[in-house]
């Protein structure tokens, strides 16, 4: 409650904190911690969540260097605010990774529904929808790169657009680009 009162009084535009704030539960990597869980649900300001400072295995450069920044969300297209934040965090000459993962399980559920409509050729629909779902975020990333360059941003944009299991693909993208 004290933390929420302070945040409400100050009304910051942006918050940077770490997982398991005011908690000893940081040893268990599967939650954000009770304070942070409440904070991100009740405030409107965006929150950058960093690893707990006592956590082992965090690469040393992760807390000192932002030469490689990855924007991750469910659907990247239209997320201008997220892209802008990520671009601002990327060091001059650094790399901004823009990531869109189309969830395979959701896609297959829709294809299954389409397959039950006799008037629609399922194979054609599956192929066309799949291509379009990957094309849209790819075009969006291209437009982001163009706008960033037009505005003088000194960074490289790397596009990650794929489909699969979201968590696995996000882990893979992060692991390959550390």
What are these regions (language model features)?
Residues 1-2, 161-169:
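Charged docking surfaces used in two-component/phosphorelay signaling
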Residues 1, 65-127, 149-156:
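Small/aliphatic-rich secondary-structure junction motif
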Residues 32, 79-82, 166-167:
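Amphipathic coiled-coil/heptad-repeat helices and related helical stalk/stem segments
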Residues 43, 143-158:
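A structural motif corresponding to the C-terminal end of an alpha-helix
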Residues 3-59, 169-178:
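Gly/Ser-rich helix-loop-strand patches that form or flank binding pockets
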Residues 134, 138-145:
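Short, surface-exposed alpha-helical segments at coil->helix boundaries
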Residues 29-33, 62-64, 84-85, 111-113, ...:
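Short, glycine/charged-enriched secondary-structure capping and boundary segments
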């Amino acid at each position: 409650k004290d933390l929420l009162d302070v945040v409400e009084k100050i009304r910051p535009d942006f918050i940077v904190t770490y997982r398991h704030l005011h908690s000893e539960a940081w040893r268990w990597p599967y939650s954000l911690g009770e304070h942070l869980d409440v904070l991100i649900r009740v405030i409107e300001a965006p929150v950058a969540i960093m690893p707990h400072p006592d956590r082992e295995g965090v690469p040393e450069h992760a807390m000192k260097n932002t030469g490689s920044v990855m924007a991750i969300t469910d659907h990247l297209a239209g997320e201008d605010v997220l892209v802008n934040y990520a671009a601002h965090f990327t060091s001059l000459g650094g790399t901004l990774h823009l990531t869109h993962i189309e969830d395979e399980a959701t896609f297959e559920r829709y294809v299954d529904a389409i397959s039950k409509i006799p008037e629609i050729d399922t194979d054609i629909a599956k192929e066309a929808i799949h291509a379009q779902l990957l094309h849209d975020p790819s075009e969006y990333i291209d437009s982001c790169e163009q706008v960033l360059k037009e505005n003088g941003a000194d960074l490289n944009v790397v596009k990650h657009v794929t489909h699969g299991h979201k968590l696995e693909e996000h882990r893979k993208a992060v692991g390959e680009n550390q």
